[in-house]
From Swiss-Prot:
Pfam families xref list: Cpn60_TCP1 (PF00118)
Organism annotation: Thermotoga maritima (strain ATCC 43589 / DSM 3109 / JCM 10099 / NBRC 100826 / MSB8)
Family, as annotated: Belongs to the chaperonin (HSP60) family.
UniProt-listed InterPro entries: Chaperonin_Cpn60_CS, Cpn60/GroEL, Cpn60/GroEL/TCP-1, GroEL-like_apical_dom_sf, GROEL-like_equatorial_sf, TCP-1-like_intermed_sf
Record's protein name: Chaperonin GroEL
The reaction(s) this protein catalyses: ATP + H2O + a folded polypeptide = ADP + phosphate + an unfolded polypeptide
Positions that bind ATP: T29, L30, G31, P32, D86, G87, T88, T89, T90, G413, D479, A480, L481, D495
Function summary: Together with its co-chaperonin GroES, plays an essential role in assisting protein folding. The GroEL-GroES system forms a nano-cage that allows encapsulation of the non-native substrate proteins and provides a physical environment optimized to promote and accelerate protein folding.
Gene Ontology molecular function terms on file: ATP binding; ATP-dependent protein folding chaperone; isomerase activity; unfolded protein binding
Single GO biological process annotation from the record: response to heat
HAMAP family, A to Z: CH60
Record text on subunit structure and interactions: Forms a cylinder of 14 subunits composed of two heptameric rings stacked back-to-back. Interacts with the co-chaperonin GroES.
UniProt-annotated location(s): Cytoplasm
Length: 538
């Protein structure tokens, strides 16, 4: 396939045109008064969104050289989205500002390699400054503010705060379609797994067709139970306490199942048997999770624990167990809180190590069950288009909130980036030559997001920057929604530090790469041969 090449200034200008086309489409969405973008779909209804990465991903330019620039900006947005889940528009605006200023200097004769070094040094100092001003989340209110800013909706902020309140920082929160027009949070308390009672004879509530065991003992084993003899000692001990018994095993059949059912019907021992969740190695891990949550032991040959030797201390305990036809919920496990924390930390470490998305999801699910439950945000809307847009905003806001939990929060509205210029000033003083110019490029770019937020809201960015910098309070900024100057923390205009940091680092990375580009190579489009038209008359 023949190639076409572009060199030097001509190549860089083509890249810049591509960057500008994507950035100009994305930056209209920035801030509380940012607008939406409508994207045509080859099938189904069009997508309406104000999410930077969704817009960038849809843009494919006709000119192949310009398209290379567009793809690089997509990379900025995608990388920021992958790392922090939000801040994609900010990252795009920063990248455009750095590229514009950088290309001016390259055209004037600056050395691109030295410019890149200067950019990297300045960004390093700015990131240190961002980390310095970040504060830990102080409670539900902060979580609601972070989510509300990300989703541009106080209602969504409250929903996410409610969900996080219920499941904790490590809990799993999923987003699903609602069958109604309402958007609400559904919560599954305790540890739930998809296995129900083996026999309907165990049912205690015939109306709901479920088994309810109050303060039961829980026997956990990875074996198949069929012979009753090894179990008689422990069954007798449990019967003497008058408490019910839940049996979780690979399978329960034959004599054991008959014995449990008969004793339940006679009223000697209220019990229920369920199959162990999962398969293979995952089953072993989940049984161990249940054992730690309830303070019991897994009766397993691998661990050298025989059924005959089981004592009441080896059984798990819980406040309540509900078993339906195909699900079991253990509420209020009596396990040691320290052991549960250690288990959660262990699963967290596994999540960080794994590269498989499926593995990551199953580990997060296990962690959530140990941490206390799963929250589902059910999203309702009048039309399919609105539903898609709303779900997208909620997913973004969730990611932003998790990022805030990780690295804390900073004043929002572009203020933190603007004030990080103070740290860059010191770098500029220390550097010289083209490296100094590189640091100045970052200095100038750091004011781009706040300018864009102001312009999208109909204000003059330069005037607002001057007024903000006249006040030494690091949290002092401009509320573009109300058109007022205020303390950003007090007003709840906050961003996750991780989002702000990632946006800056990714923008600088791509800007540096683009400035040091000298040649562009693309495939030559094939010339379509014209097919002869049919004669008008036969």
């Amino acid at each position: 396939m023949p190639k076409i090449l572009k060199f030097n200034e001509e190549a860089r200008r083509a890249l810049e045109r591509g960057v500008d086309k994507v950035a100009n489409a994305v930056k209209v969405t920035l801030g509380p008064k940012g607008r939406n973008v409508v994207i045509e779909k080859s099938w189904g209804s069009p997508t309406i969104t104000n999410d930077g990465v969704s817009i960038a991903k849809e843009i494919e330019l006709e000119d192949k050289f310009e398209n290379l620039g567009a793809q690089l900006v997509k990379e900025v947005a995608s990388k920021t989205n992958d790392v922090a889940g939000d801040g994609t528009t900010t990252a795009t605006v920063l990248a455009q500002a750095m590229i514009k200023e950088g290309l001016k200097n390259v055209a004037a004769g600056a050395n691109p390699i030295l410019l890149k070094r200067g950019i990297d040094k300045a960004v390093e100092k700015a990131v240190e400054e961002i980390k310095k001003v970040s504060k830990k989340l102080s409670g539900r209110e902060d979580i609601a503010h972070v989510a509300a800013i990300s989703a541009n909706s106080a209602e969504i902020g409250e929903l996410i705060a409610e969900a996080m309140d219920k499941v904790g920082e490590d809990g799993v929160i999923t987003v699903e379609d609602s069958k109604t027009l309402e958007t609400y949070v559904e919560f599954t308390e305790g540890m739930q797994f998809d296995r129900g009672y083996i026999s309907p004879y165990f049912v205690t509530d015939a109306e709901k067709m479920e088994v309810v065991l109050k303060e039961p003992f829980i026997l956990i084993t990875d074996r198949k139970l069929s012979a009753v003899k090894p179990l008689i000692p422990i069954l007798e001990k449990v019967a003497q306490t008058g408490k019910p018994l839940l049996v979780i095993a690979e399978d329960v059949e034959g004599e054991v199942l008959t014995t449990l059912v008969l004793n339940k019907l006679k009223g000697t021992l209220q019990s229920c048997a369920v199959k162990a969740p999962g398969f293979g190695e995952r089953r072993k891990a989940m049984l161990q999770d249940i054992a730690i949550l309830t303070g019991g032991q897994v009766a397993s040959e691998e661990l050298g624990i025989n059924l005959e030797d089981l004592t009441l201390e080896d059984l798990g305990r819980a406040d309540l167990v509900r078993v339906k036809k195909d699900e079991t919920i253990i509420i209020g496990g009596k396990g040691d809180p320290e052991a549960i924390k250690k288990r959660i930390a262990q699963i967290k470490a596994q999540i960080e190590e794994t590269t498989s998305e499926y593995e990551k999801e199953t580990l997060q699910e296990r962690m959530a069950k140990l941490a206390g439950g799963v929250a589902v945000i059910k999203v309702g809307a009048a039309t399919e288009t609105e539903l898609k847009e709303k779900k997208h905003r909620i997913e973004d806001a969730l990611s932003a909130t998790r990022a805030a939990v990780e690295e804390g929060i900073v004043p929002g509205g572009g203020v933190t980036l603007l004030r990080a210029r103070k740290a860059v000033e010191k770098v500029i003083e220390e550097l010289e030559g083209d490296e100094k110019i590189g640091a100045q490029i970052v200095y100038k770019a750091l004011s781009a997001p706040i300018k864009q937020i102001a312009e999208n809201a109909g204000y003059d960015g330069a005037v607002i920057i001057e007024k903000i910098l006249s006040n030494d309070d690091p949290a002092y900024g401009f509320d573009a929604l109300r058109g007022e100057y205020c303390n950003m923390f007090e007003r709840g205009i906050i961003d996750p530090a991780k989002v702000t940091r990632s946006a800056l680092q990714n923008a600088a990375s791509i800007a540096g790469m683009l400035l040091t580009t000298e040649v562009l190579i693309v495939e030559k489009p094939e010339e379509k041969k014209e097919t002869p038209s049919m004669p008008e008359e036969f």
